[in-house]
Amino acid sequence: MKFGPVPLARAEGAILAHATQAGARRIKKGTRLGEDEIAALREAGIAEVAAAVLDPGDLDENEAARRIAAALKSRGVEVRDAATGRVNLHAGKAGVFCVDRALIDAINAVDPAITVATLNDHVRVEPGRMVATVKIIPFAVAGTLVDAVEAIAARGAVFGVHPFTARRVALIQTSLPGTKPSVLDKTVKTMRARLEPSGSAIAFERRTPHDEASLARAL
């Protein structure tokens, strides 16, 4: 990729480095310049633009991010659309996010132009939570770098969301003579809230005196 001033006559296909006002039209940073954009710039009296010109074999930031995200995609993870060189990946279900840190470190060591960030290992996630993001720093990268990342990702599951399995739960509470029923009621409420993210529920609850014989009978 070559970056710098580019005459309009050679700017078609280049990636605009800065947002540029062309008459009544504002052309956004990162736009791949086509015939319409070139015409608008020329009509506005602009002779050259700051832009990135891709070399043969280069991939623009969005295509590179899409390919890497596709290589990383695994069970329980959904890939969102690419924009400004970034693709976010989100949990498709509630569960536990697991990541192979060694593989992530290897990917991030390929080149500073390519970064992948994730949540920590063994984090509980809900559906829709962002678990990872792929970011291409420059406007384009060499396709060989993306090939290298794909090769690392092919070594094994880089990350994924292991969905919870819903369970029916029995809750047995013991109480001392001075224990208030409201305290036990609060415990039930708290337990239900903890079980809800996994789709689990309290099937039945039993309360018994706080002694070994009573607890044994309850069990």
Language-model regions: role of each:
Residues M1-T84:
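Short, low-complexity N-terminal leaders and the immediately following helix N-cap/first helix
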Residues T31, A109-I114, T208-E212:
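A conditional alpha-helix N-cap/helix-loop micro-motif detector
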Residues G34, S214-L215:
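Amphipathic coiled-coil/heptad-repeat helices and related helical stalk/stem segments
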Residues L41, D147-A148, L184-T187:
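Short, glycine/charged-enriched secondary-structure capping and boundary segments
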Residues D55-F164:
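Extended, charged alpha/beta regions that create polyanion-binding interfaces
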Residues R155-H210, S214:
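Glycine-rich phosphate/diphosphate-binding loop of Rossmann-like nucleotide-binding domains
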